Amino acid sequence: LSRVLFLAGLLALPAFAAEPTLYGRYEHIKIEQIGKTLPAKMDTGAMTASLSARDIEQFQRDGEDWVRFRLAVEGADDTLYEQRLLGISRIKTRAEEAGNVDPDSEPPRAERPVVGMQLCIGDQLREVEVNLTDRTHFSYPLLIGAETIRDLNAAIYPTEKYTAGQPTC
């Protein structure tokens, strides 16, 4: 009997390992390259991650595409950051989401540069693709979308906030 219980316990281990980490709707996330911790909205309705930036400019370095930008967040200094450009993200506009576009025409899409950032939430450090755009008209300078939430093997408690505490990476 003890052998059967032991084997049954081993079979159950993968189910326990697959349990998602539970985060609140808002979390503190540290951006390693920048050395800042920002409040972030964990948004399952958005696909990608987005960071509030200004003075966004694409340029060439040694034959590669790069982007330079400044943070557009409260308390940010005037530091100019440079990252290798990973691609361009085409994001639905609010007009398209609301159905306020001509169905016979190509809907307008916002094009945003995408960079790789190391993000720390709780004790998890992940390389994440983040698009850059001015989010100063939003309450949270960093948005974490469904792709990153899935990569973190996470689930979101919509009624909870800051369940992971301050980042420890």
Summary of predicted features, one role per range:
Residues L1-L7:
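Sec-dependent signal peptide recognition
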